From Swiss-Prot:
Efficient DNA binding requires dimerization with another bHLH protein. Forms a heterodimer with TCF3 and binds the E box (5'-CANNTG-3'). Residues 20-87 are annotated as: Disordered. Its main location: nucleus. It is found in: Nucleus. Keywords: DNA-binding, Nucleus, Transcription, Transcription regulation. Residues 70-80 have a biased composition (Polar residues). This is Transcription factor 21. It comes from Bos taurus (Bovine). InterPro entries: bHLH_dom (IPR011598), E-box_TF_Regulators (IPR050283), HLH_DNA-bd_sf (IPR036638).
């Protein structure tokens, strides 16, 4: 998915690096394959005396046998990890900006107030419920809502919060229960 951000250029560069690493890996695989047969034959010859120790020699030789290949795969894993980290940072940046915009759209929240994401979501949900309740009660005076009626988030024009919840659940605007 293209966002047109700097991370797209970085992703393209990382893909090009992976392609180059793939070419190196193919040329190394041929070299490693020829070495593997030589090392396997030496393991078979030396394997019978080492069986008494539980095959510890084989465990130690296995990583050295794969070291040329594992170096290339480690670089590939690191590139993939860096790409995933960059995508995650970009995702978190977008999410933080969205929460900032949501916080600034909420009335009665001063700009310098530090709200957690959970608090922001709760206030937004409460404000939406408040607006639904106003629409359900049709409290318009000449197309204008009087500020006295806007007592969110505590109560709506003198009604307790329990009445507000009943109105909100009774007047769902979306979903399968909408009429």
């Amino acid at each position: 998915m293209s966002t047109g951000s700097l991370s797209d250029v970085e992703d393209l560069q990382e893909v090009e690096m992976l392609d180059c690493d793939g070419l190196k890996m193919d040329s190394n695989k041929e070299f490693v394959t020829s070495n593997e047969s030589t090392e396997e034959s030496s393991n078979c010859e030396a394997g019978s005396p080492q069986k008494g120790r539980g095959g510890l020699g084989k465990r130690r030789k296995a990583p050295t046998k794969k070291s040329p290949l594992s170096g290339v795969s480690q670089e590939g894993k690191q590139v993939q990890r860096n790409a995933a980290n960059a995508r995650e940072r970009a995702r978190m940046r977008v999410l933080s900006k969205a929460f900032s915009r949501l916080k600034t759209t909420l009335p009665w929240v001063p700009p310098d107030t530090k709200l957690s994401k959970l608090d922001t979501l709760r206030l937004a949900s409460s404000y939406i419920a408040h607006l639904r309740q106003i629409l359900a009660n049709d409290k318009y005076e000449n197309g204008y809502i009087h500020p006295v009626n806007l007592t969110w988030p505590f109560m709506v024009a003198g009604k307790p919060e329990s009445d507000l919840k009943e109105v909100v659940t009774a007047s769902r605007l979306c979903g399968t229960t909408a009429s």
